[in-house]
Amino acid sequence: MSPQTETKAGVGFKAGVKEYKLTYYTPEYETKDTDILAAFRVTPQPGVPPEERGAAVAAESSTGTWTTVWTDGLTSLDRYKGRCYHIEPVPGEEEQFIAYVAYPLDLFEEGSVTNMFTSIVGNVFGFKALRALRLEDLRIPVAYVKTFQGPPHGIQVERDKLNKYGRPLLGCTIKPKLGLSAKNYGRAVYECLRGGLDFTKDDENVNSQPFMRWRDRFLFCAEAIYKSQAETGEIKGHYLNATAGTCEEMIKRAVFARELGVPIVMHDYLTGGFTANTTLSHYCRDNGLLLHIHRAMHAVIDRQKNHGMHFRVLAKALRMSGGDHIHSGTVVGKLEGERDITLGFVDLLRDDYIEKDRSRGIYFTQDWVSLPGVIPVASRGIHVWHMPALTEIFGDDSVLQFGGGTLGHPWGNAPGAVANRVALEACVKARNEGRDLAAEGGEIIREACKWSP
């Protein structure tokens, strides 16, 4: 008879429910450089202590379940469990608190944003002991960052490809977003590009509909790009939306774009999914395509102040998954966006090292080491009179993406693009001369109007 091997599972196992805080609340824990750290805004059900709710979040997003199980003894919970290590109140909100949770790195698959989110937010948000839960921020350790390719190219490589320096880039979303034939769509692209824009863009829901199939759109847009390049002597691009119903179809569209010789494609990274986005990002790196990212569906996730995820988390995830541009809000346009908070996640997209700064919503210091940066795209509801503020707020490494602010010009698309370009160059020139864009912006634009055709 073979000898019996004694395990923890066979010694003193006690079935039953016990409080989460007995195992998962560890205020004495000192976080490791390799831990993924999360800041959750917790709104518990009445009568539940913060320590128990914070521990519940840590448990249900890592190794825990609602009861003690025999197989807990077959592993090392101390090694693999998430830990709620700190709790702090939310100023002005009596019923809310911030729970800080540390996750051991071994809980996550390397190079997979999909797995990271499945673990951290995949299940716990439906926990009935919580009235609401919001993931405010994540600290991604260097050890995990280094398992990701990140953006296909990054800011400096994009500027080198386009041969454009010292100013923000200009873009325009073609409108109406749905209903144009491919040929008329291409004409609209051409008019904008020849007028002075650097890019035009497919709207997020332009994929391959009966009125305009993707292949026809790609062909007519490529014609517009080459014609406008020949006329202006500048490199131009159109964000060809490769988003599709399957990853295979998405890659087929990206392959066709590469064969046409265009510089950039586009993906809706939230509706398309992180696995699809990372797949496309790797293809773009390997084949020299820039990748523009649209955040369609983000407000479903990030708009509520007490439930969901803040966009800074989605921005960090995009930098890991891969994209050269991403829409980031405008501060001055028609969509929501507080200046300091917006600039906080803009820095998280562009910079290599970002210090903790709670006034800007940054809960953790983030070191991206060698991961390339992402260009923020300011879009929605902006026009030439916003140009001084946009230039001051976003700086040179940005894309200012117009729509009606170009196409709504009474003389048409090309004059609208000229107006955008003249306004931008006037603001950049004034800034470089030391003028105050915030105080003198209106005067700068009026001066530019005198000489604009």
Curated annotation (Swiss-Prot):
Q: Which cofactor does it need?
A: Mg(2+)
**Quaternary structure note:** Heterohexadecamer of 8 large chains and 8 small chains; disulfide-linked. The disulfide link is formed within the large subunit homodimers.
Keyword Acetylation in annotation: yes
Among Gene3D superfamilies, the record links this protein to: Ribulose bisphosphate carboxylase, large subunit, C-terminal domain (3.20.20.110), RuBisCO large subunit, N-terminal domain (3.30.70.150)
Gene that produces this protein? rbcL
Site annotation (Transition state stabilizer) points to: K334
Another remark in the UniProt entry says: The basic functional RuBisCO is composed of a large chain homodimer in a 'head-to-tail' conformation. In form I RuBisCO this homodimer is arranged in a barrel-like tetramer with the small subunits forming a tetrameric 'cap' on each end of the 'barrel'.
- Give the protein's recorded name: Ribulose bisphosphate carboxylase large chain
Sites of N6-carboxylysine modification: K201
Q: Which organism is it from?
A: Cruciata glabra (Slender crosswort)
Q: Where, in this chain's numbering, is substrate bound?
A: N123, T173, K177, R295, H327, S379
Q: Tell me the domain of life.
A: Eukaryota
Residues annotated as the enzyme's active site: K175 (proton acceptor), H294 (proton acceptor)
What positions are modified (N6,N6,N6-trimethyllysine)? K14
